[in-house]
């Protein structure tokens, strides 16, 4: 009997007590299979002497240039036709934006992080994923790339036709208020930046490192879905560089009237997403040192 009781006891100890749903199997005492990157310093002067710093900025410039080139050309093709049945329509525009983000994030993630968006850069800066030095440099390069991308499209289309087709610029559509537009930009950018944080989380990256496509895919898909929802409201900004580049090249009053929405909205959305992910999801302020 004693032997049997011992066997039962040993057998029971072979299996850990059932955990509630949603609780990670890994205990806090076990070593992590991933490493949290240390917080980036606010200023990093040594970056200015590093080639990788400038290479990353160039990658952001080229990626944003290509992003504006493809997406604004797609918008031009849809707006040009009187019958939307002859074009790819809103779905095609959404696929162009989402597909380009997927491809460009995949190409540049290992070089610059694949931001291609000042709102993404701002959110990651607030989470101390990069320094202020790098954040400002990225934003400048993104805006310059966007201006050049929209400028090339204007060269293809011609000044007259580019102006007649509104140059792919963002503005609040008739029937919607500025508050509607601002809300759409805040929520849309929140979805995007929250997806970026989740897809690039250190723990998830360690687990899915053998499938490098898994980070760009949900980010691109988030951009696609947000465009499907908000193109009828604002043309979908959620990217201040995209909005500013198109507005500068278009350079008409309608492109500037509501332009502040496409900076304030995305930056608020990015800040809320960073706060939610870092404080609520990851509980970083509450973790023991």
Curated annotation (Swiss-Prot):
Cytoplasmic compartment spans: 1-57, 113-135, 200-212, 282-289
UniProt-annotated location(s): Cell membrane
Membrane topology: Multi-pass membrane protein
Motif residue range(s): NPA 2: 239-241
Pfam families: MIP (PF00230)
UniProt xrefs under InterPro entries: Aquaporin-like, Aquaporin_transptr, MIP, MIP_CS
Superkingdom, taxonomy of origin: Eukaryota
Induction data: By water stress, heat shock and to a small extent by abscisic acid (ABA). Induced within 30 minutes after the loss of leaf turgor.
UniProt-listed CDD domains: MIP
Residues in the Extracellular compartment per record: 79-91, 157-178, 234-260
Annotated spans, Disordered: 1-39
Transmembrane segments: 58-78, 92-112, 136-156, 179-199, 213-233, 261-281
GO MF, any single term: channel activity
Keywords: Cell membrane, Membrane, Repeat, Stress response, Transmembrane, Transmembrane helix, Transport
Short motif (NPA 1): ranges: 117-119
Any one GO CC term of the record: plasma membrane
Main localization category: membrane
Free-text note on domains in this protein's UniProt record: Aquaporins contain two tandem repeats each containing three membrane-spanning domains and a pore-forming loop with the signature motif Asn-Pro-Ala (NPA).
Sequence similarity: Belongs to the MIP/aquaporin (TC 1.A.8) family. PIP (TC 1.A.8.11) subfamily.
Known role: Aquaporins facilitate the transport of water and small neutral solutes across cell membranes.
PANTHER family: AQUAPORIN OR AQUAGLYCEROPORIN RELATED (PTHR45687)
Protein name stated in the entry: Probable aquaporin PIP-type 7a
Native species: Pisum sativum (Garden pea)
Lineage of source species: Eukaryota, Viridiplantae, Streptophyta, Embryophyta, Tracheophyta
């Amino acid at each position: 009997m004693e032997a049997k009781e011992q066997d039962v006891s040993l057998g029971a100890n072979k299996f850990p007590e059932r955990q509630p749903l949603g609780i990670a199997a890994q205990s806090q005492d076990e070593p992590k299979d991933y490493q949290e990157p240390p917080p980036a310093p606010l200023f990093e002067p040594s970056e200015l002497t590093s080639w990788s710093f400038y290479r990353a900025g160039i990658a952001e410039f080229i990626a944003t240039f290509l992003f504006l080139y493809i997406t604004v050309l797609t918008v031009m093709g849809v707006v040009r036709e009187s019958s939307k049945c002859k074009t790819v329509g809103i779905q095609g525009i959404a696929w162009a934006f989402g597909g380009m983000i997927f491809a460009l994030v995949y190409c540049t993630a290992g070089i610059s992080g694949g931001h291609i968006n000042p709102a993404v850069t701002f959110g990651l800066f607030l989470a101390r994923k990069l320094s202020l030095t790098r954040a400002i440099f990225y934003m400048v390069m993104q805006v310059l790339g966007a201006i050049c991308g929209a400028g090339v499209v204007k060269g293809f289309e011609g000044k007259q036709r580019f102006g007649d087709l509104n140059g792919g610029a963002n503005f609040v559509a008739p029937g919607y208020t500025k508050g509607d537009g601002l809300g759409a930009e805040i929520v849309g950018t929140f979805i995007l930046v929250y997806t970026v944080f989740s897809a690039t989380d250190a723990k998830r990256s360690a687990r899915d490192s053998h499938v490098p496509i898994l980070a760009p895919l949900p980010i691109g898909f988030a951009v696609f879905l947000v465009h499907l929802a908000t193109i009828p409201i604002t043309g979908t900004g959620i990217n201040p560089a995209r909005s500013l580049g198109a507005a500068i090249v278009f350079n008409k009053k309608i492109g500037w009237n509501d332009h502040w929405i496409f900076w304030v909205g995305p930056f608020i959305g990015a800040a809320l997403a960073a706060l939610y992910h870092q404080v609520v999801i990851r509980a970083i302020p509450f973790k023991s040192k």
